[in-house]
Amino acid sequence: GVAFGTVAHPTARLCLEWLHDHNLEGKSVLDYGCGSGILAVAAKKLGASRVLGTDIDPQAIEAADYNAEVNRADASFYLPEDMPDEKFDVVVANILSNPLRLLAPALLARVKKGGYLVLSGILERQAEELIEVYGSYRPDSPLSVWKSMDGWICLAGQIH
């Protein structure tokens, strides 16, 4: 498997575990709000065929590019306005619950039919509200709590 230090925040660990527990072989993955690119690098190492990351912070893009290079992971990172217009088998977003709420339509639009949306950066008490928000856009594709760790949760669901 992929080894990362125990320093990772619980939300990053939850997302890493989700990626690890699902077969990414030949799949496309978008790391939305990629930060240093840890999830994108992991997805590539776990067999994803195409991996993109996006972040609003230009310094994050630089850090992610660097981390992908040193880990020999073929992943590309973009500012949101430069992102190619495509859909992905897996969209993972480890950001905070407020931006996740506002980004619901944008994130859902990036998931291929039958693909998965994986969200973290969410406190247990925020889960219900986010499940409702995403459900209001896609009643046919409910998200649910996949796992929790130290008061943080990971929501995931298949988008139909």
Over which residues does each language-model region extend?
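Conserved SAM/SAH cofactor-binding pocket of Class I
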Residues: 2-84
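S-adenosylmethionine
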Residues: 56-160
